[in-house]
Amino acid sequence: MAIGLIGRKVGMTRIFTEDGVSIPVTVIEVAGNRVTQVKTLETDGYRALQVTTGTKKANRITKPEAGHFAKSGVEAGRGLWEVRLEDGEGEGIEVGAELNVDIFADVAKVDVTGQSKGKGFQGGVKRWNFRTQDMTHGNSLSHRSNGSIGQNQTPGRVFKGKKMSGHMGAERVTTQNLVVVRVDVERNLLLVRGAVPGATNGDLIIKPAVKA
């Protein structure tokens, strides 16, 4: 069985192979994911697991959250996440069960979803990798400006979705096909090759790679 789990980005480091090759890895802490609800085709129209992880102070829990956790008999966590299930997945998992990183023991590659680091308002050069204009040759004001953003009277407007300056980052990003380098069951750690979205301590959704 290989369904998605919720983890926390610990940071990056490197490990060495027996041949002395350095591999950059991201360390993800995948503490116990407690099942708070099992959604079925009959009651919800689709199959999914709702899970929580971590802890949350009692004075930070809203009454609806408290009722939901009490109904499931699960300790309140720092949030609620939902993981879709395909046919045949998650059979036998009940409310209150705890899922751990060992379910990735036989998984070669994973997709990791997180919220990218926010960069604030940025121009086209940084946000979209536009090339800069001439530094000299009569250009004194438009070194990093976008340049032309459209045509003339026809169509007489700027098309929607045009790449321009604006808010960069702080959006949901998925990095696909990250190689699983190591699964540390004792310390609840998952080591994947390369970088994952988001800052240190950010929440991540780890799923088996769909394109592996």
Curated annotation (Swiss-Prot):
PTM (free text): Methylated by PrmB.
Cystine pairings recorded for this chain: none
Region (Disordered): 136-157
Single GO cellular component term: cytosolic large ribosomal subunit
Compositionally biased region (Polar residues): 136-155
GO biological process per UniProt: translation
Record key words, sorted: Methylation, Ribonucleoprotein, Ribosomal protein, RNA-binding, rRNA-binding
Single annotated GO MF: structural constituent of ribosome
Domain of life: Bacteria
Location of N5-methylglutamine modifications: 153
Classification via NCBIfam families: L3_bact (TIGR03625)
PANTHER family (UniProt xref): 50S RIBOSOMAL PROTEIN L3 (PTHR11229), LARGE RIBOSOMAL SUBUNIT PROTEIN UL3C (PTHR11229:SF16)
Function: One of the primary rRNA binding proteins, it binds directly near the 3'-end of the 23S rRNA, where it nucleates assembly of the 50S subunit.
Family of the protein in this entry: Belongs to the universal ribosomal protein uL3 family.
Subunit structure: Part of the 50S ribosomal subunit. Forms a cluster with proteins L14 and L19.
UniProt protein name: Large ribosomal subunit protein uL3
